[in-house]
Structure formats: structure tokens, C-alpha cells
Amino acid sequence: MKEQLDGLLQSALKEIDGAGSEEALQELRIKYLGKKGALTAVMKGLGALSAEERPVVGQLANTVKDQLEAHLDETLAQVRDASKRERLQRERLDVTLPGRRLPHGTKHPITLVIEEISEIFAGLGFRVAEGPEVELDFYNFEALNFPKDHPARDMQDTFFVDDSILLRTHTSPVQVRTMLKHAPPVRIISPGTVYRCDSDATHSPMFHQIEGLMVDTGVTFGDLKGILTNFVNQYFGKGIGVRLRPSFFPFTEPSAEVDIACVMCKGKGCRVCKESGWLEILGAGMIDPEVYRHVGYDPETISGFAFGMGVERVAMLKYGIGDLRLFFDNDVRFLQQF
């Protein structure tokens, strides 16, 4: 039986050395060391040996088994290493080659308009202030002279979370928060997203506004008109006509709607301006004393103005866009034009 074990070992080692794949080595492991393998068959014959021969042959069989397992594991590691080297050689990358060129993105037209308007007002001494989009009723309405029973609240279709929390309907709450934190003088603009329950070709339930605030001693309506005229001339071009019409906003008094000469027909009258020659772009006015009282300012010693414009409205006039929904449809053909 010793000769049989020695012959089995030599034959197995030779076959293992000749195996060139993991599959072949696995088959040899089963052939020699499996439950029905050659070595297992030999060890089953130990019972027929004498008591003196059995431990000697059994120890030899275990030695053969250990040698075969060790050689199988070593050869398997070599085969796997060779396979890995071959794959790396086959899939080798030339790291000196230039990378794939990705298409360049562009800024969204709304972002471009916000940045351009912000830059103009920065040149006029205004800084950018921001605030939360989910607001308290106090900041969005009450502090801006919208009492709970005020009919002016019906002018805005509001998304309410509960009785006191809502999605802001304008960025004016930023002005209230700023005045509560800072003493005059204050000069800010507050660009941001606002929400109203409205949706059609010229309205969206989510849109963008830029509102401005200036509070100091001796601020007049003439200052308001001068700053807004300066903005219009910088943004739409010099020589654009500007007019102010009386209007109403709960947080300003007096209040005005600001129109510019139609950028499409140069004031001659067309379909866009409904033959009037004028286009409304923003609302403005002198801050109501009641707003000052809510933020702790003394209306007897300071004065100021506020204004606000819809960014989409300005962008539509700037670029001649007829449908507000184009800004939100994510149509690459439209966005690539900017």
C-alpha cells in the first residue's frame, strides 16, 4: 500500500503541474481528495491492514494528503496571479492619453439674470441678503402690514403648511429679518425662490424674485426713482423710458408700479405691450411707518424705500421669451441658447 500511495502522489503532482486553469485544478482536487477520490479510496483499505501496519500507512496517507493540498493551493495561487497579470496587460490603459471631453454646461438663464441684476445693485451699494423659503406668517405678512383679516392677503395665493407656517410668497420677509438684526443704515437686495398657487403661460407656482430695501435718514422718493432708473438704464440699455404709476402695497406708502418703454417696439405699441408702449417690470414705494414699528425703527427719524421684481418677468423681457414654462421644462435646445 505504501507503493500505491507513493505512485498516487507522483501521478497527482505531475497532473497538478500540468494544469493551466482554476477549473482544471478544481477537477484534480475532486479527483484525488474528494469523497470519491483516489486517496479516499486508498484510505478506506486501511481496515484490512495489520495493527502494526495501520498507523504507519495512515500517517503516510495523511502526509500525501497534506502534500497534495499544499501543492494544489500553491499552483492555484500561481494560476490566479498569471491570469491577473495577463488581464492587466490586456486591459492596460495609457494614462498619458487625453481624457474624454465632457460637454460644457452653461448657467441657467434665471441664474444669469439674478447674477447680472445683483451685480448692478452691488455697484449701487447694495449687498445680498438671504432668508428661509419656509416662513412664519409674522415675517411674510404681519410684520409687513398684512393683519390677519386684511383683504390684501387675498392678493396672494399662499401655500400654507399650518396656520402660522407657509412657503414665502415674496422675499420681503428677508427685509424684515434684516431690519430686526441691523440698525440703519440698511441697503440690501434679496434674490430668491418664492411660491404662489398659480400656474399658466405667465405664472408658475414657484418663481424667483429680487427685492430691494434702503433705509437711512433723509431717503426720499426721488432717491427711489433715481436708483431704479439707473438700474433700468444699465440692464435694458441707456435711453429706455421709465415711468411710475400710483399703486397700492400694504407695506409701502406711497406705492408705485414701475414701467419701462416696451423693449420690443421701443414704445411705439405692439402685441407684447398691448399697444400701450409700456411694460410693467416692478413695484416699489416708500416703506410704511407701520413696518418700522414692527422692527423697532423710529419712523420719525428714518425713512426708506423698497422695491421688488419677478426675475422670470425681467428675463422674458430681456430675451424675448413668450412662455414662462420654458424656464422650467429643462429643454436643452432652449437652455443652450444662453
From Swiss-Prot:
Q: What's the catalysed reaction?
A: tRNA(Phe) + L-phenylalanine + ATP = L-phenylalanyl-tRNA(Phe) + AMP + diphosphate + H(+)
Name the InterPro entries for this protein: aa-tRNA-synth_II, aa-tRNA-synth_II/BPL/LPL, Phe-tRNA-synth_IIc_asu, Phe-tRNA_ligase_II_N, Phe_tRNA_ligase_alpha1_bac, Phenylalanyl-tRNA_Synthase, tRNA-bd_arm
Q: PROSITE patterns in the record, alphabetically?
A: AA_TRNA_LIGASE_II
Which keywords does UniProt give here? Aminoacyl-tRNA synthetase, ATP-binding, Cytoplasm, Ligase, Magnesium, Metal-binding, Nucleotide-binding, Protein biosynthesis
Q: Which Pfam families match?
A: Phe_tRNA-synt_N (PF02912), tRNA-synt_2d (PF01409)
Q: Which SUPFAM superfamilies match?
A: Class II aaRS and biotin synthetases (SSF55681), tRNA-binding arm (SSF46589)
Note on cofactor: Binds 2 magnesium ions per tetramer.
The protein's GO terms of the molecular function aspect are:
ATP binding; magnesium ion binding; phenylalanine-tRNA ligase activity; tRNA binding
Tell me where the signal peptide lies: none
First-tier enzyme category under EC: ligase
Q: Which cofactor does it need?
A: Mg(2+)
Q: Which family does this protein fall into? A: Belongs to the class-II aminoacyl-tRNA synthetase family. Phe-tRNA synthetase alpha subunit type 1 subfamily.
Q: Which HAMAP family match?
A: Phe_tRNA_synth_alpha1
Which PANTHER family does UniProt cross-reference here?
PHENYLALANINE--TRNA LIGASE, MITOCHONDRIAL (PTHR11538:SF41), PHENYLALANYL-TRNA SYNTHETASE (PTHR11538)
Quaternary structure (record): Tetramer of two alpha and two beta subunits.
Tell me the NCBIfam families matching this sequence: pheS (TIGR00468)
> What name does this protein carry?
Phenylalanine--tRNA ligase alpha subunit
Q: From which source organism is this entry?
A: Geobacter metallireducens (strain ATCC 53774 / DSM 7210 / GS-15)
Q: What is the lineage of its organism?
A: Bacteria, Pseudomonadati, Thermodesulfobacteriota, Desulfuromonadia, Geobacterales
